[in-house]
């Protein structure tokens, strides 16, 4: 059997998104407490980079992989390396995953926003050609809009190099339009 390195590869799509940054911090801390080191890989959501990082993880004999991916990486996973994916489901593949209850989470978020006085909740979405948990978040948002008689509003993001700048611009555009989102 090949000796492992005590490394776990963590593949994320973006380091600037506050959610991914916080999640990566928690993952790294949990791995460290177990005596493992983190090999952080930022794919920028580019399938070729994700595949290259999977290959790099295999070459470095990692103990495992945690992948937050927007791509169908199922065909490129080394069956000898344990992997878990986050908020992603690959049809016809037995890949362990961690997922939230995105449908009800979205409903709860809209309810909380309305409770806090928000009159126009907007759903910000990033596109992926693969089905995933974001579809359930969208469905929860639409159900909440229907339940509370809100006209759904979507902000489509094709590419986001800087999440924080994007959110600032989004906020400015709605304030300029006189919206209380």
Task: List where the protein language model places each region.
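Flexible, active-site-proximal loop/turn residues at the rims of small-molecule/cofactor binding pockets
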Residues: 14, 71, 127
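Conserved beta-strand positions in the central sheet of alpha/beta enzyme cores
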Residues: 9, 66, 122-123
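Short, Asp-centered acidic motifs that coordinate Mg2+ and/or phosphate
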Residues: 63-65, 181
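Short, polar loop motifs at secondary-structure junctions
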Residues: 67-73, 86-91
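Amphipathic helical "hinge" segments at domain boundaries
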Residues: 1-56, 60-63, 139-145
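Acidic (Asp/Glu)-rich catalytic clusters
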Residues: 74-80
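Short loop/edge segments at beta-strand edges and connector loops
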Residues: 42, 69, 156
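Bacterial carbohydrate/catabolite-sensing allosteric modules
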Residues: 29-36, 48, 52-58, 81-85, ...
């Amino acid at each position: 059997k090949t000796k492992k390195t005590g490394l776990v590869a963590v593949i994320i799509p973006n380091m600037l998104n506050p959610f991914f940054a916080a999640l990566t911090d928690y993952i790294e801390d949990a791995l460290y407490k177990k005596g493992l080191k983190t090999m952080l890989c930022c794919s920028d959501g580019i399938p070729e980079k994700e595949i290259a990082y999977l290959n790099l993880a295999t070459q470095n004999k990692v103990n495992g992989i945690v992948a937050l991916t927007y791509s169908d990486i199922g065909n490129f996973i080394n069956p000898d390396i344990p992997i878990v994916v986050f908020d992603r489901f690959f049809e016809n593949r037995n890949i362990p995953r961690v997922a939230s209850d995105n449908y009800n989470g979205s409903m709860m978020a809209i309810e909380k926003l309305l409770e806090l006085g928000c009159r126009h909740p907007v759903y910000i979405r990033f596109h992926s050609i693969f089905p995933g948990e974001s579809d359930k978040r969208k469905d929860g948002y639409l159900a909440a809009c229907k339940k509370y008689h809100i006209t759904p509003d979507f902000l489509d993001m094709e590419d986001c190099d800087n999440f924080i700048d994007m959110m600032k611009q989004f906020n400015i555009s709605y304030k300029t339009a006189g919206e209380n989102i």
